[in-house]
Amino acid sequence: MTRTDAIAQPKSPTDPFTHHDGPPPSPWLMAMEFRAFWEFGSIVPFWPLLQRAPVGDGHPVIVFPGLSASDGSTVPLRSYLSTRNYEVSGWNQGHNFGPRAGVLEAGSHQIHEAFLKAGKRTVSLIGWSLGGIYARELAKLHPEWVRCVITLGTPFSGAPESTNAWRLFRLTSGRDIKSESRRFQLPVAPPVPTTSIFSRTDGIVAWQGSLQRPSKANPNTENIEVIASHLGIGMNPSAMWAVADRLAQPEGAWQAFGRKGGLRGLLYPDPAR
């Protein structure tokens, strides 16, 4: 499969979808990452509301954790999606220390096994932060096995240094982040329905680096903004609801997320504003 795509050009230098080469989030936003504890704690009071999200059709879902995290970090999200009638699994590769040798190969094998086990039903891929890079790239490699891709705070369209985690990446992976970024066309969307969930108050990843630019090759892409921290976005009730809503769409009948009506306009700001 060739990794080419007709990416729409930005309308002007102020276009929100311009490739982000700016600085990472400010020290103030980074200090506010402690909000993740509140986001985790808010799952319990919001649980009855979360249970009103659409119920799925039982297709398989794989969730990829962020940098240095393991499947333990995605337990709240995976547990919730299990109640929405999905066959959910973690990535089963321990801690995510970057694109080590064999990581993508193991991911490919896992997706194929899930695809076959489900009777050749396509698999939805969800990735938190760096895990979203894996989800996107694996979907590019194997679109015939993948139903949709959803990323949470994933920096795929910005310069490597536009995150506050690039030094941690180099330390844990032993690799140069610029070299790794050049190996892939990260801003290019996979050829499947693709959703990027991001937050302008992300203290680790510059939010502009999580914006999916419009694509002529794949019109089924979107950005959903939530109010969340980076470390808590995978446990944030608004993000969890959006994930469940996206997964519940009938295969082959993708529609963009409806953020208008009721409280949605407050919980999900306009990402293009």
Indicate residue ranges for each PLM-predicted region.
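Generic surface-pattern signal
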Residues: 43-46, 112, 116, 173-174, ...
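Glycine-rich phosphate/ribose-binding loops and adjacent secondary-structure elements
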Residues: 94-96
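Serine-dependent carboxylesterase/thioesterase catalytic core
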Residues: 59-72, 76, 82-91, 100-192, ...
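Helical cap/lid subdomain of alpha/beta-hydrolase-fold lipid enzymes
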Residues: 140-273
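Flexible, membrane-associating and regulatory peripheral segments of lipid-active enzymes
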Residues: 1-62, 74, 79, 84, ...
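A generic structural signal for short coil/turn motifs at secondary-structure boundaries
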Residues: 98-100, 232-233
